[in-house]
Design a protein with these regions (language model features):
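Beta-propeller domains
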Residues: 1, 84-96
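Blade-loop segments of beta-propeller domains
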Residues: 1-20
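Beta-sheet-dominated scaffold domains
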Residues: 10, 111-265
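Conserved beta-strand positions in repeat-built beta-propeller and related beta-rich domains
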Residues: 23-26, 77-80, 125-127, 168-170
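Short, surface-exposed terminal/edge motifs of secreted or surface/virion proteins that either
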Residues: 28-42, 171, 176-179
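Asp-box/WD-like beta-propeller blade repeats and closely related beta-sheet repeat scaffolds
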Residues: 34-67
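Surface-exposed loop and turn segments in beta-propeller and other repeat-based domains
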Residues: 45-58, 99-108, 187-207
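Solenoidal tandem-repeat scaffolds enriched in leucines and small polar residues
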Residues: 61-83, 107
Length: 265
């Protein structure tokens, strides 16, 4: 189709029939590999696994998702440029079937979806200026609840889980989705005030689509790298954040990175 693939995202899962991996790139259909065969997920497919061809799917699928994750034994896809507010999910325990009759569906986020990430018992749906979460209600259906309409995520690949929280880059700095003592409630406090001016400048002047993030769990660190193949390595910048223990209190410290260009993490 002449479009360029800039990033490939994936999720690994096992719904009881062995390990699978599903890929999404925002240009082509999502594709699933079961260790032997590849199957494209297309909305034009009638649904289910078909050994005679290389496609699967159903009418509830989105055809060129940029985002993929696993939640409650469903494959979730989103980030299709033509339907930016749609969050699609497969039938339960069946990544190849995307028909409503089998239990697949689409959820309208109400805004352009930047990222989807499971955290505890919810699937968080990030927009540029709003955050919602998908959970399973008493009727065993997926329900969409508002988290905040006052803040969102400005960098798709900034959303990382570390230290029991879900970190993301907001317009005013890094914020964690932190669970509180009240069931179902979250906190969204800024944790990067010491470098807020630096972060605001980076957001203003850099392409957030080129941001890549990684968690270094052995060091309780997150590292973000900004820059793509068109950026000289010497001009590539980034942010490093680490959880520290000072006098029995856990907190964040941040610093700047320079000269490391990463195309993926």
């Amino acid at each position: 189709n002449g479009l360029t693939v800039n990033k490939l995202r994936h999720a690994v899962f096992n719904f009881g029939t062995g390990n699978h991996i599903v890929f999404a790139d925002g240009v082509n259909p999502a594709i699933i590999f079961n260790g032997t065969n590849w199957k494209e997920i297309k909305s034009s497919h009638s649904g289910g696994y078909d050994a005679s061809n290389n496609t699967a799917g159903g009418a509830q699928a989105v055809n060129a998702p940029a985002l993929v994750d696993i939640f409650e034994n469903h494959v979730f896809l989103s980030g299709h440029e033509a339907t930016r507010a749609a969050v699609a999910h497969s039938a339960p325990n069946d990544p190849y079937t995307w028909t409503a009759a089998a239990g697949a569906g689409q959820i309208a986020a109400g805004f352009d979806v930047v990222q989807i990430k499971p955290f505890r018992d919810d699937l968080f749906v990030f927009g540029n200026n709003s955050i919602k979460k998908i959970n399973v209600n008493a009727s065993n259906d997926f329900a969409l609840d508002q988290v905040t309409a006052n803040v969102g995520c400005v960098a798709r690949d900034s959303v990382l889980e570390i230290g029991g929280d879900l970190m993301f880059l907001a317009p005013d700095g890094f914020r964690p989705v932190a669970g509180t003592s009240r069931i179902g409630d979250v906190e969204l406090e800024t944790v990067s005030k010491p470098i807020q001016a630096t972060l605001v400048d980076i957001i203003k002047n850099e392409d957030m689509e080129t941001l890549n993030g990684v968690v270094i769990r052995s060091k309780s660190q997150i590292r973000y790298f900004i820059g793509d193949s068109t950026t000289d390595a010497s001009d590539s910048i980034g942010i490093i954040g680490g959880l520290t223990n000072s006098s029995g209190s856990i907190g964040w410290e941040f610093g700047e990175l320079l000269g490391i260009r990463a195309s993926c993490c």
